[in-house]
């Protein structure tokens, strides 16, 4: 670790450890990670391709699904260069500007995903509670506005983070015990007070993920009331069945996020590898599982994918 003793280098770079202490088996660890990244890319690209090429899927529900797939793809590609760089080439140094850029995209896309999940819950609410006005409420123009507002809100709230980190002097260490750059990990290396960063980080989470999760819960409360008011048991099951994929996507996103938050807040005594694994679960499991869930649980998507593979054969 020459970087630890090279003062001039420390001023320009961070040092990513990956799975520290397991360097001799990094090539083996890379196999499941490569498989996950490949599956994420193929799965989400397939979803995007199917929705784009099939005119019958040009509906609000599938537009939102395309947004989710695009966000998952971006989140995967944000971490891929440094993760595989460490495993394959032992490339552990990352310039501070590059690190802050990666941090910006990871956190922005995480917030975009939360916002897209909220938009999808609104879609389900309108489809079940106000089906006759579904196409007039969720017009293509309005869907585009919802997508753009998700990106703008997330980007504008995350944009200050690199500047808040840039003002610090990192005199203790430039070693990040991760394979990518995260705000919480970088600010721990600062010599001066991090109270401003800490408060702003909590503010961002509260007004994005916090608000989104409450509104998703509210939408499903109203959906459940509407479903229970339906006359026949078959109608209730049909209505709930259209929500299963989205509920799975919500759980896949929020449960790892809550787990990661609990580990960061109360898991100081836990081995470092637990922190690492939780961060990988949070960033990789939703992009990995969302295409699988929607392919299995959404009949239209499943049928179109099967047709594509039959055509290839």
PLM regions with names:
Residues 1-313:
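Transmembrane helical core of 7TM receptor-like proteins
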